[in-house]
Amino acid sequence: MLGDYFIDKCTSTAIENAPWAHQYFADTLPEDSFKKLRECCENIKIKNAEPKFYTDVSGTYISCPILIYPKDFKDYNIDFEDEIYSIAKAILENARVLCGQYPRYRWFQNLGVNAHISITPPLPYKFYIHQEGLEKIWSSVTYITPEKNIGTKMYKAQNEKAFIKEAIWKPNSTFIFCGEQNKTWHSYESNQATNRITLNLFLMKHSKQRNFYQRHLYQ
């Protein structure tokens, strides 16, 4: 099962502690599964030619990423819903194990997995330095395409001078962490002329307003 493969990668990877607890590993998915996902993503036709905009903390207008949820995969000819289901189910079933690797983590009784493909604009796109939303417990980002780009940057504080390291962009590599308030500062951006596409999986408090795989589905 693909879900078991993903969990094995997560639980067999050591925690790195600088600048805060996180994991980073390659070969997240088996070669054939990743090839299938990448080909689907490279052929995505974006329906909304004009991206939405929002204002970041500095007051600068930046493009809003387009998020494609499993329920909408068929609209974009993405044939990967069964695989995402397997991974999300495994994350829920192993929630305590995944989080228990970390020194500190949040917890909620009503859990869900928010799974989606994120399409962020080409350069000069940049998502400002931020911390994870308080509703998120465990965050995983798998790099899909293009071949070269900028990964996730980590900081000790919410300013550029506090930059410590980058989870390097490499297709089929994954960056994971458990959000801690006022600590897990990070940002991401694009330095290429093509969309930056990732697979995002968030273990978090369930919300009816969001797209979730819910714990009760598997009980």
Put a short name on every predicted segment.
Residues 97-116:
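A short coil-to-beta-strand element that immediately follows conserved catalytic motifs
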Residues 117-133:
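Conserved short histidine dyad/triad with adjacent acidic residue
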Residues 112-119, 184-190:
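Acidic carboxylate-rich catalytic motifs and surrounding loops in phosphoryl-/glycosyl-chemistry enzymes
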Residues 125, 134-136, 144-219:
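Catalytic core of Fe(II)/2-oxoglutarate
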